[in-house]
């Protein structure tokens, strides 16, 4: 009986971990389902492989993505990771500007030894 009493807290802790892990997984799955249900043609998305594309058409389980002007490919809906928001485009432009500034500063600090 004593061994059972010592083992009971361990079981409760493990049960709690399992409950919270499954709850988090369920929430993530529901968020993915909600995203896939809310997609509309014309929106920009990221795929799970990192590709950025524009939605052209949506079917039950598939989605047509334009990856370059005039280039349309068909993907499973499950391959869509997230929607690209207009703020993301602004952030990318800001990062490019910052990279140029860093390159300019790095170029000014170069020291050459011309003897």
UniProtKB/Swiss-Prot annotation:
Per its UniProt record, what SMART domains does this chain match?
YajC (SM01323)
Transmembrane intervals: 1-21
Principal location class: membrane
- Asked whether the UniProt record includes Oxidoreductase among its keywords, one would answer no
Give GO cellular component annotations, separated by semicolons: plasma membrane
How the protein sits in the membrane? Single-pass membrane protein
Does the keyword section mention Membrane? yes
Chain's role: The SecYEG-SecDF-YajC-YidC holo-translocon (HTL) protein secretase/insertase is a supercomplex required for protein secretion, insertion of proteins into membranes, and assembly of membrane protein complexes. While the SecYEG complex is essential for assembly of a number of proteins and complexes, the SecDF-YajC-YidC subcomplex facilitates these functions.
Name it.
Sec translocon accessory complex subunit YajC
Q: Which organism is it from?
A: Mycobacterium bovis (strain ATCC BAA-935 / AF2122/97)
Source organism phylogeny:
Bacteria, Bacillati, Actinomycetota, Actinomycetes, Mycobacteriales
Q: Gene name on record?
A: yajC
């Amino acid at each position: 009986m004593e061994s059972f009493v010592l083992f009971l807290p361990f079981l409760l802790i493990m049960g709690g971990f399992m409950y919270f892990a499954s709850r988090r997984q369920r929430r993530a799955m529901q968020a993915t389902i909600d995203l896939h249900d809310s997609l509309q043609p014309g929106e920009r998305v990221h795929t799970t492989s990192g590709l950025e594309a524009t939605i052209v058409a949506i079917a039950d389980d598939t989605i047509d993505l334009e990856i370059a002007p005039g280039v349309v490919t068909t993907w499973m809906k499950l391959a869509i990771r997230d929607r690209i928001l207009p703020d993301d485009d602004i952030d990318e432009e800001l990062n490019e500007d910052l990279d140029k500034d860093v390159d300019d500063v790095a170029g000014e600090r170069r020291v050459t030894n011309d003897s």
